[in-house]
UniProtKB/Swiss-Prot annotation:
Disulfide bridge partners, by residue number: 34-98, 183-189
Keyword Disulfide bond: yes
GO biological process: killing of cells of another organism
UniProt keyword annotations, A-Z: Cytolysis, Disulfide bond
Function per UniProt: Cytolytic protein with insecticidal activity. Acts as a pro-inflammatory agent.
InterPro entries in the cross-refs: Aerolysin-like_C
Post-translational modifications reported in the UniProt record: The N-terminus is blocked.
Protein name from the UniProt record: Cytolytic protein enterolobin
Top-level taxon of origin: Eukaryota
Amino acid sequence: TQRDTLTKGMTQGQIVAGPDDTKIDQSIMDQGVCATIALPFDIHVAQSVKNVMFMFAWTQKHGLAVNNLVILGVPGYLNMWKRFGESTDEPSESSKRCCYEKPTDPVSGEIVTPAFDPADEISEITHQEESADIKPVRLLDARLLGYTWVTQNHSWIVAYSDEPIKDGNEVVTLRNIGNNNFCDALRKCTDKSACIHQYLQFAWNSFGDPTVRTRQVVFEVVGWADSDTTNNNSDTLFYRTTQADNWQVLTESKTNTIGLAEVDWFNFKYETKQEVSIEIARQTWTSTLNAGVSTVSRVPKVPIKVKINVDTFLKVLFAVYKADLYDIFLQFASVFKKGGNRQYWLNYTQEPNTKSNYNHKIYNDKIRYLQEDVQVHPNETQSKWWWWSFKKVALTTMTVVALTRFKASGINGQYISARQFSGGETVSPYRLAAPFDSCLWRRSPNPLGTDGLKVALAHHPLAGASNRNKLRVSIPAQCICSITA
């Protein structure tokens, strides 16, 4: 439908497609349509268009009214609407809600970023040939319990756990099991490394039999933790990682390459911060945090009936893509849920050949949900990789993926970008110069000329000597930064 539908009054269940500059023009009026084909238009969505952090009245007071239609975003009236000028603060049709159409899959350049399907992801990682696309394991959806991983000699094997074994009051999952439960040639072991989960009551799911590829272990166990009323610790889940004495990788044993250590604080979903993660680190066993022990237990408090995901993965995952995939698209849509000034901090160095320190860190520690799609340019050497890191996911800083120099980066949502470089570069409000070439900000899918989208400089790099080499730019929603290297 056309934009003038709003002028004439919305028809129940009708989708109104409008311009990109306001999501209110993309609305649906209906009793329950929001829950099926649309997303609710609330204060968090409005925040990506205009600062409405004090949205305690109808939205015409904040410049968001559209053709006599106003939306209430305060608690208790979320997504309600009424006509402008009505005397009551109650919605004129309280059974209706205002929504906006669910966005389509993000597009980076002309390459469509496919929707994430766990089954497809697992199949690609574990069953395809060496030359096939390898996607990073999704590490950034704020797992409730924490992380464990195994790594050795910068090499990797991908293998998902077999069906969990219920043993008394424990659930045991064995890593890297080959045919008939025997290890293949890559792992010379009799007693395999095992994760033991002391459960309350679990309903387990599994991704089926594992498939071994090259040299990394990755597996996931998913279950529900229910309160066990027969014990005093009725809301406690015990997660314990054990390591067999004779567990070996090739010719190297845990005594000289594999260690067991605790990881950093993890933000538990319903509680305060608790240190619940465990790391099997590649370092001398006797130098790890828990030297001389093979078991580490943590006791996070688990609310009644909560889903528990236990992931095992490498600390560093390397992704190689086909030659025609060269864009990077970072989708931050799920970050902007609780309001607030979400900021991201990007650091860049002129010396990628000697320093792996291209970091992407969360500037605001309150951000907990983040999704990532990464595509890299092939045929680059390791000396040209930069590293992307995300802060406050499971570790203070977690290296997610090593990738070659990027071509384009897209952000969905308002954010602050800071580029740091050396030298007295001349920077205009329209084109952002950088040592490796240039960065043009443009609106997607319709670029606004060669100078890109005009952006407001929150902090000019030439404003003072202390900030001479730093540029901070506020970017409106749905812009793409094209980088040519």
